[in-house]
């Protein structure tokens, strides 16, 4: 007998939700059933982010650095940074060099006396912000700014952190200092946006982007360094009924089992005796998938011998 020769099996959201309902002993019948299941599915993927590193969400990113800029924005869906380095001669086959950035904590970063010291960056503090943009403006511009101005006068700075990011129009601006009512040492066009002209009175919004603080700050000209990092991103949202999910095929049994357990906790027609069984099945399926979704490189532990005389 011949086999199909295909390995493309996947579940669209409609089928995934229907399978989860059947495991609860129910049938998917109404539009509300679909909406409540989709909501639970999105919550489920957020839970997975709290369980550890999901290897399929690990991505590399690069940022060209600037002279004396310590603060670098990360994509808004960043959960954490796994590793980072500063690279010189980016793209050169003969002399590209990466030097690892050592991760330090916020208290350790605060103990650095002069955070504006220049040199090749060797340390980083990862500031894991929410990525949310304020829904109401914190302040407004006083006087217009060109696309190259790095000093920005505001009506008030009372509601702004002394270091961070702001959105003006469609532009994201990084800044490292506030003096009086002015943002000084601003870095324009951050996080994939373009520096633009802004008129007086325009609203200014606080943007809580996840970011990296490096030390020392890059020495001139600055752009000889490229910040190279591996990050863990969020799992993409469930989407509509004809979409497949942002997971490898190995996690399909786990996702179905997890959604069935989530639904069993809130749907009134589920037999209460099913809930412990569905929870146990979910935990087993997640453990099976997580055990496979791991690094398989060899690790060697060597004891450190210390001698006292």
For the regions a language model picked out, list residue spans one by one:
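Glycine-enriched, solvent-exposed interface loops adjoining structured elements
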Residues: 1-136, 205-309
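Autoprocessing Asn-cyclization modules and mimics
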Residues: 55-64, 99-102, 129-206
